């Protein structure tokens, strides 16, 4: 099994956000921030952006992961889709990619390695992105991903730090991928739920490229290793707002709620909860299993969009017509100005109820 080579799969293998923050604090930023560097390390965004002229900016990212499935082709597809998503999450369009790969070459058969690479190539072809080479090493754990270059107009960049008071939120996919992945690893995921799982992790978030053209879309990111809660905190902190969300309206994959009750969470869900402790607030009497659903790490999760209320209906309609049938908006969500560095993301069961902080 490919998953037997790794201690965590997909975006669940990411370094915990608290440890990452400490690590990066010890690494100085570029001594002279180039004026053309429009997006760098400031807010932990999905990609870097460098302006090359008045009409064009380059979007650059790299993303790789360990297996969260045993099928090598599906692993390659999921890793590639997840990497491309970072460019889409900036409002950009990918134009080229190169592969990043590492395998225990003496333990994994060559045909399985070829299937991983074929999966990545097929996803790039589906997205119209040439895969122009890469770099491969002998490594104890299988890893695969992409370095991706995209393009965006400098005035249409979408960051994770531009939400405004009064914005609404749209999420384009249900939650629960980390739970489904954990259930798969212990042979507790039924076949029909596995098929849903595969469809989600290989679905390309290409809607981000046209969301960049909509001025009323203020902030954009993809929901990945830090879970919905973590990415909401990052988004709220960057804009200095507080986001409140009605948690019982958040869509979940069919098996996720029962798996949560059974405690089938990946380690990343617990690490995320600890890392964002103090910046999250949940409704009264919530048990830990309910809370962990929102810190569950997603692999190639949906887009997280904040936008002006008047644009919600038209954006939702377009999402539903263009491959995001489960996209949902939170008209009961509010962003409130705050001067305190706590409870940036508030989850409650009724609009205005629970939560606090």
Please describe what each predicted stretch is.
Residues 343-357:
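Hydrophobic alpha-helical segments, chiefly the membrane-spanning helices
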Residues 1-334:
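Helix-biased detector of long, well-ordered alpha-helical tracts
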Residues 331-338, 355-357:
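Conserved small/polar residues in nucleotide/adenosyl-binding loops
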